[in-house]
Amino acid sequence: MHNAAPITRRKSKRIYVGKVPVGDGAPIAVQSMTNTRTTDVEATVNQIRSLERVGVDIVRVSVPTMDAAEAFKLIKQQVNVPLVADIHFDYRIALKVAEYGVDCLRINPGNIGNEERIRSVVDCARYNNIPIRIGVNGGSLEKDLQEKYGEPTPEALLESAMRHVDILDRLNFDQFKVSVKASDVFLAVQSYRLLAARIDQPLHLGITEAGGARSGAVKSAIGLGLLLSEGIGDTLRISLAADPVEEVKVGFDILKSLRIRSRGINFIACPTCSRQEFDVIGTVNALEQRLEDIITPMDVSIIGCVVNGPGEALVSTIGVTGGHNKSGFYEDGVRQRERFDNEQMIDQLEAKIRAKASMMDENQRITVNLVDK
């Protein structure tokens, strides 16, 4: 029920990764990357399908060898989400996966080779209508830039990116996006700011090698939150040393928190104190697990007492405010006569949320049909 984010998106060109639009105001796409061995086709396909179930828009797959390229062909045939092939060192692998229907090629300027090899990749991409991501990383800058700057700096990452943007410009190829990732939050943020001021291509955001599930999510939320709040960014990936499914969840949570893109339930819950009239923490944890399948955007407030509960409920799709034995129930900001038994809170609230999601989905379907007519 909250208003849309007061953020003006940076203007950028539109490209397509498979059928997913990127840039020019398109919804910011959430990306992840497999961490299986690509040659293990079954494991990789299963992981991609698990990512699809939590709403991933694009999946990157590492293709380090020609054997992996052959496996990529089989993987591509068994999944629906667009796949990006991650290519390092051997440009010929990029040429091979292009034959197999890859949706985007990610190349690293620091190790893909000379301009002639890049030209070969670009010619192949153009022929097969495949976009490219120039992926600059603070940990793998070109040797001459390492010597020039001494260490990764925003200017070094920018120079690396622009060096290869200029090559693509000379080759009259504009179907590309760019990333300038670093593990240091401020280095990454400033690098993206400099790049955003120089080009109008779509930008892929990420804090590389951010860390484990908790620390990596925090770093990514800070870095990407700063950039997204400034309107910078067209796709994103949360790099975690954790299950890739968590990357997707955190990515959507960041977009949801900034009211840029909503998918599923935005839970608003108090941290609890001695005033709570029911088990808020247990209720929230249970509902988050039970309702993972809900993709309808809605705000659900679960507040343990009447201090802040009514106020939060007024701006929530569904709200509950703790009371003695029974708690108040709100729908679309309006208090209902019905009250929830505190001992049955989880089951009752789940039923109300599912019913509301179903009604909202049906209303959306009717609206779309009327517009189409």
Curated annotation (Swiss-Prot):
GO terms for molecular function: 4 iron, 4 sulfur cluster binding; 4-hydroxy-3-methylbut-2-en-1-yl diphosphate synthase activity (ferredoxin); 4-hydroxy-3-methylbut-2-enyl-diphosphate synthase activity (flavodoxin); iron ion binding. It catalyses: (2E)-4-hydroxy-3-methylbut-2-enyl diphosphate + oxidized [flavodoxin] + H2O + 2 H(+) = 2-C-methyl-D-erythritol 2,4-cyclic diphosphate + reduced [flavodoxin]. Its cofactor is [4Fe-4S] cluster. Pfam families: GcpE (PF04551). GO terms for biological process: isopentenyl diphosphate biosynthetic process, methylerythritol 4-phosphate pathway; terpenoid biosynthetic process. The keyword Iron applies. Binds 1 [4Fe-4S] cluster. This is 4-hydroxy-3-methylbut-2-en-1-yl diphosphate synthase (flavodoxin). The lineage of its organism: Bacteria, Pseudomonadati, Pseudomonadota, Gammaproteobacteria, Enterobacterales.
